[in-house]
């Protein structure tokens, strides 16, 4: 199986910086801004974007995580679900501008699950979506507001994102 490196470490760093600037422009600064990374790699990307925004604005914005495990539509819901546990952040996200962050946008089902988790717990003013890679093949009417790189793929190909925080390297690879 052949592999192609689509983004290396430097490209990922530049992309995270660009997305941070785009989010600041979209929100006209940092007021009421919240970042929520979808576990697991979205969490690391959210932290990187938070760090870039801090470098740019000298202000640290609230950042947390979304665990979509119990909101997926391809598994049965577990009765022990505590929906409040789906979002891990130290501030209320009601009446805030929430940016969901993930590594790859594919069918849209992960994003739909994250929207369910958010809206079950709060009522943000606005919700945006930032992804490192958009590979197409949507099954739901969902699109990202901030895209690092559009990578047209076939359904047979896989897009793998490697992040240093968990994979000891930074790369986006198509197999």
Swiss-Prot record:
Q: Which GO terms describe its biological process?
A: DNA-templated transcription termination
What cystine pairs are annotated? none
The family database entries (Pfam families) matched by this protein are listed as: Pribosyltran
Judged by the first EC level, this protein's enzyme class is transferase
Q: Which InterPro entries match?
A: PRibTrfase_dom (IPR000836), PRTase-like (IPR029057), PyrR (IPR023050), PyrR_bifunctional (IPR050137)
In chain numbering, motif PRPP-binding lies across: 98-110
| Endoplasmic reticulum in keyword set | no
Keyword set includes Glycosyltransferase? yes
Q: Which GO terms describe its molecular function?
A: RNA binding; uracil phosphoribosyltransferase activity
Reactions catalysed according to its record: UMP + diphosphate = 5-phospho-alpha-D-ribose 1-diphosphate + uracil
According to its UniProt record, the EC number is 2.4.2.9
For this UniProt record, the keywords arranged alphabetically read as follows:
Glycosyltransferase, RNA-binding, Transcription, Transcription regulation, Transcription termination, Transferase
The text of the family note is:
Belongs to the purine/pyrimidine phosphoribosyltransferase family. PyrR subfamily.
How is the subunit organization of this protein annotated in UniProt? Answer: Homodimer and homohexamer; in equilibrium.
Q: What does this protein do?
A: Regulates transcriptional attenuation of the pyrimidine nucleotide (pyr) operon by binding in a uridine-dependent manner to specific sites on pyr mRNA. This disrupts an antiterminator hairpin in the RNA and favors formation of a downstream transcription terminator, leading to a reduced expression of downstream genes. Also displays a weak uracil phosphoribosyltransferase activity which is not physiologically significant.
Q: What protein name applies here?
A: Bifunctional protein PyrR
Taxonomic source organism? Staphylococcus aureus (strain bovine RF122 / ET3-1)
User: Quick one: which gene encodes this?
Assistant: pyrR
């Amino acid at each position: 199986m052949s592999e192609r490196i689509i983004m290396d470490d430097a490209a990922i760093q530049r992309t995270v910086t660009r997305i941070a600037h785009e989010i600041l422009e979209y929100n006209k600064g940092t007021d009421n801004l919240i970042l929520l990374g979808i576990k697991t790699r979205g969490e690391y990307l959210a932290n990187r974007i938070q760090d870039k925004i801090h470098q740019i604005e000298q202000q640290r914005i609230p950042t947390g995580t979304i665990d979509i495990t119990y909101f997926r539509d391809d598994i049965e819901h577990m009765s022990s679900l505590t929906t409040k546990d789906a979002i891990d952040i130290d501030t209320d996200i009601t009446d805030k501008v929430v940016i969901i962050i993930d590594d790859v946008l594919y069918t849209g089902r992960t994003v739909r699950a994250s929207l369910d988790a958010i809206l079950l717990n709060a009522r943000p003013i606005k919700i945006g979506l930032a992804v490192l890679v958009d590979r197409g093949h949507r099954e739901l009417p969902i699109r990202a507001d901030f895209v690092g790189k559009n990578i047209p793929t076939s359904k047979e190909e896989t897009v793998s994102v490697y992040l240093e925080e968990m994979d000891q390297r930074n790369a986006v690879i198509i197999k």
